[in-house]
Amino acid sequence: MGSSDQATAHARAQAASARLFDDACAVIPGGVNSPVRAFTAVGGTPPFITAARGCRLTDADGNHYVDLVCSWGPMILGHAHPAVVEAVAKAAASGLSFGAPTPAESELAAEMIARVAPVERIRLVNSGTEATMSAVRLARGFTGRAKIVKFSGCYHGHVDALLADAGSGVATLGLPSSPGVTGATAADTIVLPYNDIDAVRQAFAEFGDQIAAVITEASPGNMGVVPPAPGFNAALRALTAEHGALLIVDEVMTGFRVSRSGWYGIDPVDADLFTFGKVMSGGLPAAAFGGRAEVMERLAPLGPVYQAGTLSGNPVAVAAGLATLRHADAAAYAALDANADRLARLLSDALTNAGVPHQIPRAGNMLSVFFTDTPVTDFASARATQTWRYPPFFHALLDAGVYPPCSAFETWFVSTALDDDAFDRIAAALPAAARAAAGADEGNS
């Protein structure tokens, strides 16, 4: 089906996905293994994806979509990139897991260290949540302090201490935190408004000798894209250093996506610890945390801070990550930036023509669509946007063969695989989607 055909085909087949969703709900809570996938924020039945190649997804009903989610960020080269598939197949043929060191683990760590100057040592783990959890534990062990400062709307995985006022699925579902997080755990977390350096100064004035670390997304993408104000991350570095606390920069989303060196390549602030995921795993379950040697060498077996994982450094995931990073060259990052520019222009033109108030903030090649005339600078202003316009906008795009993020608080991601046919489909779909947003009824939100 051509782009113009599917852009006007509003009777998208869904029977197979609906049946699969019912089956999933019978055995998996909510039918999904990560809450945002359930389409809670936009309604309807999530398509069940059966295949992907390049920038295109195929669902169980045979519908095809231009992918603007990219598995929530990792797929910078597109799906089933030949070099990544070949590397994974070769690694899998040699064995899936050994519970022992492998040469490729050190190669991946060295590749990451070469890209982010302050990182001198890397520890591989299995998820971004595990990376931030371990970084927080290490910061507490290194400083001998308990309190952690985080920011409203920043999401660092489902770590108990960091779920308070978080972004991503917590924002999508409208949850302030999560049942099961104890008061004692929450008491050691100080939550501050994002981009408010005066609030950080006040926190250090009150609790400075108790604060182990400040953790921040390098450039937040879990309340939508809300870049740091100029100098904000540098000011965090200065304040933490002044008070003997560590700075943890979460680059799980931005790392090796927005530049060869992640957000560090755009805003080079020398944090004590960084967390990574998504791109560095090539789409398989792997993540990492790293930083200066003095801190990292407090980890077991060299030091007393314990961290371990049966599948950490999994050879198949490491192979996918290495292949992705080695093919993410200057041309790839130029293509990502150009594709993000092109997508942002199409979005803005369509929404402007339909008279829809909007902001399209950027963090390198990451972007978001906020329905508002007012710049979004923190979680409060993100939540104040006209989110009720998003579900009809989303579904109009989905019905026309374009797959955007299924929440107003999530990031839009591009890949190098986006081609002219994909952009033609997006361009054909956007006018009707913009009109749907313009005609949205706040009372139905």
From Swiss-Prot:
It is an enzyme of class 5 (isomerase). The keyword Isomerase applies. Pfam families: Aminotran_3. It catalyses: (S)-4-amino-5-oxopentanoate = 5-aminolevulinate. Transmembrane segments: none annotated. GO terms for cellular component: cytoplasm. Disulfide bonds: none annotated. Its cofactor is pyridoxal 5'-phosphate. This is Glutamate-1-semialdehyde 2,1-aminomutase. The lineage of its organism: Bacteria, Bacillati, Actinomycetota, Actinomycetes, Mycobacteriales. The gene is hemL.
